[in-house]
């Protein structure tokens, strides 16, 4: 495509971000090794209406992982570390998992270690815009004395491994991760505006202020009761004071220099093997590739090799994607939390759209599957019972909300995924791609008892329920103080208007101070559905049928229910 036509199309793709009094993005595009597009849209600071440009500094969040991994790679190149090195040889406190964890397992995310962010935010109730210190991170890491799977058995995205890699850099070099990365990566490449922030009070020149929708920050009643404001946006920032998994602050201009280094390495020995190391996926125990390199996803995009990684945290979103064989790249930095839904490769994201332009791909819609689906939908009327309503899987606490639109049912789960289901007869529905089967079980009175889901080889059972306010006398047994000694965190459970209010005893850590409505048995569901989803809490009883504990249930399968809050009074 001609350069002028390409730039015109790129402007069309990005124009929705060109708004006054609204956050925006910085976009850089490289084609065949040449920078063809570099532009800012929207505002870096809404207080002073400062516009975004290529020198605006953004938090690029999880894009930090590739820089942390590069630090480790440099130390391996020096002979100061090895891939098969046992991490407990550096940090003895990690031996409590009972299994050898290697640097290889951390780099390629084949470790199964629980995510410290899940523990901090979704168990301890720390707010997204609060600071988390190094000591707090270590407390959460050592409190998780289990793994999801054996080392190297599976791949699972997580932040803990890269936090530990950052700590390994500091332990080996006797300097901070921030200083080591600056001396050995940023300065050699001329990335003069890039740094790893380990001090939330740091003054950042030309910083883009981070923003979120008002309800994203002020989602619980303990905030809203003090304000009648109707703002659409709020300032937001993830004030974590430790690097490794995140906290990379950078500019579009600097990331373009980083992108160039993939083709002509200027770090340390200048070896091309170093770049190959960064961009080659790791292997599982069975010899299969895991799809993840050193802080970079590695895959295929319409027949082209692609390396890429996104970033998301309070107030910011980012994405970097490179087609190395075509020497073409896309870099996007934004100062709004929800921009993460626009970037990346889901639902035709911005990065995907730009990459398609670069490779000359024309997206032609294939109506074949849709036509086939329409034929199946004609049978929808044969199912007489009304499926609409809420359902819960008591094992995982995952929720469904089933709705009906134009004689077609849609299943929306706790994570916001919506699945169109089609009727195949004999009380059986299937997803449009036929990968999921939903079997409706009814009693002799034709009342739905449950829906059985088969997703691949896995089965789960969802039971219908109605949220209900129940008499205060029945709720009284749940009241009291509950404590998790592992985390040094306590919650109070009180009754209010037929609901339970669970509140952190540390009033500053109020992210999970929510009202809960009764759902089924001893499970309660939060009234508010935000970025934390519909939150579930299940209480446990002893042999005398007395309430003895509660846990936060976990439909994301990170096992946060392993943290038990025991009733102490």
Which residues are covered by each model-predicted region?
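Catalytic loop of the DD-peptidase/beta-lactamase superfamily, centered on the K-T-G motif
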Residues: 1-39, 179-182, 187, 229-496, ...
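Hydrophobic (often cysteine-bearing) scaffold residues that line and stabilize catalytic clefts
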Residues: 6, 10, 60, 64, ...
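Short active-site loop at a secondary-structure junction
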Residues: 16-28, 47-109, 148-160, 243, ...
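Conserved beta-strand positions that form and line the central face of beta-propeller blades
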Residues: 40, 51, 59, 86-90, ...
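Short linear capping/connector segments at secondary-structure termini
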Residues: 43, 55-56, 86-93, 120-125, ...
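Short, surface-exposed loop or secondary-structure junction motifs
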Residues: 45, 98-319
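Residue-level preference for well-ordered alpha-helical positions
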Residues: 76, 88, 108, 169-170, ...
